[in-house]
């Protein structure tokens, strides 16, 4: 890893891909509200005989892939905070202060947005709906919520965000270690997908809930990278000339 005090120029950023793909995905998700895809996928994991989702009380899904996995990601976040703090005092970490700061900020924002959005949107979980043994009435994302004394707290997906928030690692590594950054992207996407499917099997979320979560996490991490780390080659060249003049 390069350890110079001057950060390297950022690799070219394809804004059409970074912004366009999430935008198209969001439009598709809105259009999917006109279909029964979410319900159809949820029914694949629902056992009408038992009257519950097949993974509702699964030790693997609840204790391992939910509780323990979340603790691991929290531990990683704490480690990132310690690294960022250490970058103010430890010489070996000082060149990476901005990367570590971007990582910490991205992790914080990509997880903290979930709870307030759940409260505002009040979307019900599949396991709470009449179609799956519950007592609540289904409503599309952009439709008014039926009157209830138990508002939903299921959009976007909190556990999916635990995985997709690691997009932050991709951006933190993007300029210095591009190959490792690509591996981090694949890992974050795979982990978020596994967490998403596991919660769908438990009846905690619909498919669209988790895709929305991936979009939000990506956009948050991209925004943090752009404002904190992104430096086109022209800016780096100008900084180098300024240092040369100062010397």
Where are these regions (language model features)?
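N-terminal transmembrane-helix/juxtamembrane module of multi-pass inner/ER membrane proteins
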Residues: 2-80, 118-126, 135-136, 246
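Membrane-embedded catalytic cores of phosphoryl/pyrophosphoryl-handling enzymes
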Residues: 15-16, 21, 138-247
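Alpha-helical transmembrane spans of integral membrane proteins, capturing the lipid-embedded, hydrophobic core
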Residues: 22-26, 76, 103-112, 214, ...
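Aromatic-anchored segments of alpha-helical transmembrane domains
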Residues: 27-30, 110-115, 190-200
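Alpha-helical membrane-inserting segments
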Residues: 31, 78-85, 113, 117, ...
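Transmembrane helix-loop junctions in multipass membrane proteins, especially transporters and channels
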Residues: 37, 89-96, 119-127, 204, ...
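Transmembrane alpha-helical segments in integral membrane proteins
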Residues: 71-91, 159-175
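Interfacial segments of alpha-helical transmembrane regions
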Residues: 84-120, 181, 185
């Amino acid at each position: 890893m390069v350890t110079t005090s001057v950060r390297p120029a950022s690799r070219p950023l394809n804004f059409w891909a970074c912004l366009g793909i999430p935008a198209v995905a969001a439009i598709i998700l809105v259009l999917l509200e006109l279909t029964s895809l979410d319900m159809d996928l949820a029914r694949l994991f629902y056992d009408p005989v038992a009257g519950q989702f097949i993974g509702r009380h699964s030790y693997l899904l609840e204790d391992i892939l939910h509780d323990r996995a979340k603790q691991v990601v929290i531990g990683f976040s704490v480690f990132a905070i310690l690294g960022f703090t250490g970058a103010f005092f430890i010489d070996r970490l000082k060149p990476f202060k901005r990367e570590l700061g971007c990582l910490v900020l991205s992790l914080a924002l990509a997880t903290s947005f979930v709870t307030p959005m759940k409260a505002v949107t009040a979307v019900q979980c599949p396991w709470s709906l009449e179609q799956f043994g519950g007592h609540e009435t289904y409503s599309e994302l952009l439709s008014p919520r039926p009157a209830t004394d138990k508002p939903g707290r299921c959009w976007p997906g909190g556990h999916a965000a635990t995985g997709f928030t690691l997009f932050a690692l991709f951006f933190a590594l993007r300029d210095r270690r591009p190959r490792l950054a690509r591996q981090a992207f694949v890992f974050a996407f795979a982990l978020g997908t596994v967490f998403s499917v596991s919660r769908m099997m438990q009846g905690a979320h619909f498919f669209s809930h988790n895709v929305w979560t991936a979009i939000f996490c990506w956009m948050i991490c991209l925004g943090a990278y752009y404002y904190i780390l992104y430096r086109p080659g022209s800016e780096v060249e100008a900084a180098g000339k300024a240092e040369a003049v100062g010397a």
